[in-house]
């Protein structure tokens, strides 16, 4: 049985993917993204160093629309990254989390997406 993202890709349904992950991860994510994301999709990035930046760079290199939602420290102070995580979770159709199993920020975003009923794919690295 195919996953929801696979079926959407096959049927050319536009999907908005949040691609998030641990800052400590320095993995090649090209194959992960190219297997899941089509030219007509959109990637949402949190703009953080690591997976967020790599995903945005991959999208730009492949002509895929990108939205970067950065934390608004001026308004929310030190809670800004957590509020940004919730905004990303609410804005996406599917979340791809490339996670080291330790990052609390990535876990926070995963939990927001699950609570919002979004499809979440966790790739442990």
What are these regions (language model features)?
Residues 1:
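Non-catalytic, low-structured ubiquitin/UBL-interacting segments
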Residues 4-125:
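Acidic/glycine-enriched connector segments
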């Amino acid at each position: 049985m195919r996953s929801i993202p696979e079926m959407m890709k096959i049927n050319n349904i536009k999907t908005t993917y949040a691609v998030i992950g641990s800052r400590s991860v320095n993995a090649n994510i090209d194959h992960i993204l190219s297997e899941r994301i089509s030219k007509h999709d959109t990637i949402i990035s949190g703009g953080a160093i690591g997976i967020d930046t790599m995903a945005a760079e991959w999208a730009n290199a492949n002509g895929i629309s990108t939205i970067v939602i950065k934390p608004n420290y001026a308004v929310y102070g030190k809670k800004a990254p957590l509020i940004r995580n919730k905004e990303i979770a609410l804005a996406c159709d599917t979340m791809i989390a490339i996670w080291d199993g330790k990052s609390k920020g990535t876990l926070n975003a995963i939990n927001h997406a699950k609570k919002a009923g979004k499809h979440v794919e966790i790739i442990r690295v």
